[in-house]
Amino acid sequence: MTKTKIIFMGTPQFAATVLKGLIDSNQYEILAVVTQPDRKVGRKQELRMTPVKELALTVNLPVLQPEKLSGSVEMTQIMTLLESGEVGIVTAAFGQFLPGKLLDVARFAVNTHASLLPKYRGGAPIHYAIMNGEKEAGVTIMEMIRKMDAGDMIAQNSTPILEEDNVGTMFEKLAFVGRDLLLETLPKYLEGQLKAQAQNEDEVTFSPNISPEEEKIDWNKSAREIFNKVRGMNPFPVAHTLWNGERFKIYESKVADEIVNNSDNPLQAGQIVEKTKKSLKVATGNGILELLTVQPAGKPKMDIVSFLNGLGQKMQVGDKLGD
């Protein structure tokens, strides 16, 4: 059997799972893997490879890491590989916009996008699906065009978002959904057995990359909205508030009470309303939020009991979180 020649482009673990599926299927000749440059991470600012690069190196695939594709040496190398007209492009969470001339010369160009398009075009679809309280998420295999995530849809599959899910768990689930969907549908698509369907432009929504401002918790929102925001940013970029003028990250929480604050007992949003040796509850614009896992400035992530036994002893009922 002649293997389909492709160039794979992707960056995080989601993409590495998809790439591993392509490798293991033994149906594809992967001429090159394109991923983001190594980045410095953590307090020690250690240089770290992307999960896609780590995987590619273990199986001796050539790796290209352009800071930006347009005008780069790597772009020239990719164009050379594509010139035969027999090589396709497969992407999954690459993190860069592909120049149009790549799409022009590739045999085909398909993207594994982690949303049920046309909802959540953009770089943070899983984050926004959770933050918006969606009950399901999914993956779309789609044709790539010059407009971001706007190409015709080849296939879709969905999976539930459970109350206990966060960005990390959904990334993992959807990576396998995307892997299986791509492996099932790409051969059929290339053989002409599947016809791509246009997206309904009236139903388009966007999920741009999370801004630093978006990470801040607005305590005037409801407990349910803040709960969704916290899990929609765990484990990255992590929702945060201020305590004593310093950043206070919240990784996990739960809605303790969704009753609307009434005029007989008005609570100030962001105010600590209950503190025991094992729990900490905060008033919101509507309802009470219980904090479960936090990270004070300059400290490691910890469960709420550890926090309350240590630094949290300084926190008192009536104290206010936020600006």
Swiss-Prot record:
<protein>
    <recommendedName>
        <fullName>Methionyl-tRNA formyltransferase</fullName>
        <ecNumber>2.1.2.9</ecNumber>
    </recommendedName>
</protein>
<comment type="similarity">
    <text>Belongs to the Fmt family.</text>
</comment>
<dbReference type="InterPro" id="IPR005793">
    <property type="entry name" value="Formyl_trans_C"/>
</dbReference>
<dbReference type="GO" id="GO:0005829">
    <property type="term" value="C:cytosol"/>
</dbReference>
<dbReference type="Pfam" id="PF00551">
    <property type="entry name" value="Formyl_trans_N"/>
</dbReference>
<dbReference type="InterPro" id="IPR036477">
    <property type="entry name" value="Formyl_transf_N_sf"/>
</dbReference>
<keyword id="KW-0808">Transferase</keyword>
<dbReference type="InterPro" id="IPR011034">
    <property type="entry name" value="Formyl_transferase-like_C_sf"/>
</dbReference>
<keyword id="KW-0648">Protein biosynthesis</keyword>
<dbReference type="InterPro" id="IPR002376">
    <property type="entry name" value="Formyl_transf_N"/>
</dbReference>
<dbReference type="InterPro" id="IPR044135">
    <property type="entry name" value="Met-tRNA-FMT_C"/>
</dbReference>
<feature type="binding site">
    <location>
        <begin position="115"/>
        <end position="118"/>
    </location>
    <ligand>
        <name>(6S)-5,6,7,8-tetrahydrofolate</name>
    </ligand>
</feature>
<comment type="function">
    <text>Attaches a formyl group to the free amino group of methionyl-tRNA(fMet). The formyl group appears to play a dual role in the initiator identity of N-formylmethionyl-tRNA by promoting its recognition by IF2 and preventing the misappropriation of this tRNA by the elongation apparatus.</text>
</comment>
<dbReference type="Pfam" id="PF02911">
    <property type="entry name" value="Formyl_trans_C"/>
</dbReference>
<dbReference type="InterPro" id="IPR037022">
    <property type="entry name" value="Formyl_trans_C_sf"/>
</dbReference>
<dbReference type="InterPro" id="IPR041711">
    <property type="entry name" value="Met-tRNA-FMT_N"/>
</dbReference>
<dbReference type="InterPro" id="IPR005794">
    <property type="entry name" value="Fmt"/>
</dbReference>
<dbReference type="GO" id="GO:0004479">
    <property type="term" value="F:methionyl-tRNA formyltransferase activity"/>
</dbReference>
